[in-house]
């Protein structure tokens, strides 16, 4: 069976942690930020982990 190809768009957006979880960046912080509070924009800069519901799907894209 041939090797699975990595989904390049996913590879650029997600990073695997040492424990095998996936890190991602938050959305809604790139533009239209004038109406958002400074606290909200600051919290959007932080990364977070991918939810368990999405892990199986993303694991297939990043073998």
UniProtKB/Swiss-Prot annotation:
GO cellular component entries: cytosolic large ribosomal subunit
Transmembrane segments annotated in the record for this chain: none
Keyword terms, alphabetized: Ribonucleoprotein, Ribosomal protein
Signal sequence annotation: none
Entry's Gene Ontology molecular function annotations: structural constituent of ribosome
GO biological process: translation
Pfam families registered for this protein in UniProt: Ribosomal_L35p
InterPro entries from the UniProt entry: Ribosomal_bL35, Ribosomal_bL35-like, Ribosomal_bL35_CS, Ribosomal_bL35_sf
Entries under PROSITE patterns matching the protein: RIBOSOMAL_L35
PANTHER family (alphabetical): 54S RIBOSOMAL PROTEIN BL35M, LARGE RIBOSOMAL SUBUNIT PROTEIN BL35M
Family stated for the protein in its record: Belongs to the bacterial ribosomal protein bL35 family.
Protein name: Large ribosomal subunit protein bL35
């Amino acid at each position: 069976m041939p090797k699975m190809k990595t989904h390049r768009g996913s590879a650029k957006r997600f990073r695997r942690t040492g424990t095998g979880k996936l890190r991602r960046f938050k959305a809604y912080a790139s533009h239209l930020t004038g109406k958002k509070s400074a606290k909200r924009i600051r919290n959007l800069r932080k990364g977070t982990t991918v939810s368990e519901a999405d892990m199986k799907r993303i694991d297939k894209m990043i073998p």
